[in-house]
Design a protein with these regions (language model features):
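Membrane-proximal intrinsically disordered regions of secretory-pathway and membrane-system proteins
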Residues: 26-33, 250, 404
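Internal catalytic domains of large membrane-associated glycosyltransferases
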Residues: 12, 28, 35, 42, ...
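Glycine-rich catalytic cores of cysteine/serine-nucleophile enzymes that process amide/ester linkages
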Residues: 36-114
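Bacterial Sec-dependent N-terminal signal peptides
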Residues: 1-30, 409-410
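A short, structured loop/turn motif at beta-sheet edges
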Residues: 31-35, 64-69, 123-128
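Alpha-helical membrane-anchoring segments
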Residues: 28-34, 51-53, 262-266
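A cross-kingdom signal targeting lumenal/periplasmic-facing segments of multi-pass membrane
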Residues: 78-170
Length: 410
């Protein structure tokens, strides 16, 4: 009964929102728009609660009225969650595809999700609209629709933008995006849209390296659908020959409005990465002081830390060496999180291996200091919760080195 009620409620809402007229019409339309029934729009959906919805979503809508009319969405954000999806995503081998289907099915999905949906009708000539539609149809063919997803440079937002720019360039025109006062790095953009998901941003900060800290151009900012919407709203189309300008967007509509942003609440401070890291640091200091006082070494604790750091190091080095994802090839976290961390987890139990363990801990201290120096010099930005974890590793390594030197290990 509740499902039926919800279904009919959504249908009623769609009946209202689909009948809404444009909230604003700013630009002067092209000369032949009134005689042509083909309309092309950029669709932008506000962020949702799932990880893959945090940045919002973009798609293309193409409509034609008349007896042969249609209302289609060209959606570049479709993927298959197969058994090996996680492995492929980690390797950077994730394939997305362009799906074409009735726009109403697309809209109802976001209505039920509670995400606001915007439509920006593009101010294109008849020839440009036809060329763009033809390009989208060719792209949607079975042999062309699959593409290698890149979350920064080739995603559901950059693809529609690029198709529009290509259609214009074929007709001797190009898009000029209005400049902005402030540009951000990729890491700053990810942190902004993932602000309520502290563990997600913490993991991204660990996994992605120095490239994420380069300042993105305004064009590169548009991998975020909401920023693409803003850029298109202020953009103009310039004719290469006459230098005549017109607005890229002729009308903006709000197809569905949600008063509640469907984003999860922030992580409680006591469950945040920083709180957990500080707790681990406090435990480490307590155990280390007890080791100093009793003259013994808590091998069990070093084993636990070593196993966790080893597994983290395996992931980091896999991303650095094997992954095709952007911003993974140069990562300073590889200095203090390495697969070699398994050594302090195992070697202290073998007396003859103590010199090797001391060698590892000595090198670890040097690498941690190098990591801190490079971060302080601005080579790479790191999450603040990393510092207590680095301190944990440093304290245990220094503890082992001093214990070995004083020959206090029993």
């Amino acid at each position: 009964m509740l499902r039926k009620l919800r279904f009919f409620t959504v249908i009623a809402m769609l009946s209202v929102v689909l009948g809404m007229r444009a909230t604003s019409t700013v630009a002067t339309p092209c000369d032949d728009v009134s005689t042509d029934t083909l309309r092309v729009s950029l669709i932008t959906c506000a962020p949702g609660p799932e990880v893959y919805q945090l940045f919002g979503h973009s798609a293309m809508r193409v409509q034609r009225s008349g007896v042969d009319g249609f209302d289609l969405v060209f959606n570049y954000g479709v993927f298959s969650f197969s058994d090996d999806f996680i492995l492929k995503f980690t390797q950077g081998h994730t394939d997305y595809m362009l799906a074409v289907y009735d726009f109403q099915y697309f809209l109802i999905d976001y209505v039920m999700r509670g995400s606001t949906v915007y439509e920006q009708e593009l101010n294109l000539t008849h020839a440009q609209r036809e060329a763009l539609f033809d390009a989208l149809c060719i792209n949607a063919r079975a042999e062309n629709r699959v593409y290698r997803y890149n979350f920064l440079y080739d995603n559901c937002a950059t693809r529609p933008r690029d198709r529009v720019e290509q259609a214009l360039s074929l007709m001797g025109e190009h898009v000029v995006y209005a400049p902005v006062d402030t540009l951000y790095t990729f890491r700053e953009l990810i942190r902004h849209y993932g602000a309520n998901y502290s563990w997600l941003t913490f993991g991204i900060d660990l996994a992605l390296g120095r490239e994420l800290d380069s300042e993105a151009t305004w064009h590169e900012h548009m991998f975020v659908p909401m920023l693409l919407q803003r850029a298109c709203d202020e953009a103009v189309v310039v004719n290469d020959s006459t230098m005549h300008e017109r607005r890229l967007v002729s009308a903006t509509r709000e197809l569905f409005h949600s008063d509640v942003v469907p984003i999860n609440p922030p992580t409680p401070w006591y469950l945040s990465p920083m709180a957990c890291a500080l707790l681990l640091l406090a435990i480490t200091i307590f155990i280390t002081l007890r080791d100093v006082r009793t003259g013994r070494l808590s091998r069990w604790y070093d084993t636990l830390l070593g196993v966790v750091m080893c597994l983290s190091g395996v992931v980091i080095y896999f991303l650095v060496i094997c992954s095709e994802h952007p911003a993974t090839s140069f990562n300073l976290h590889a200095l203090w999180l390495t697969p070699c961390a398994i050594m302090p987890a195992v070697l202290p139990y073998v007396r003859k291996a103590m010199p090797v363990a001391r060698w590892y801990h000595t090198v670890n201290v040097v690498l941690i200091l190098l990591f801190a120096l490079l971060v302080v010099c601005g080579v790479q930005c790191v999450d603040s919760a990393v510092w207590p974890l680095v301190a944990v590793s440093l304290i245990r390594s220094l503890n082992f080195v001093f214990y070995y030197k004083r020959n206090l290990i029993k």
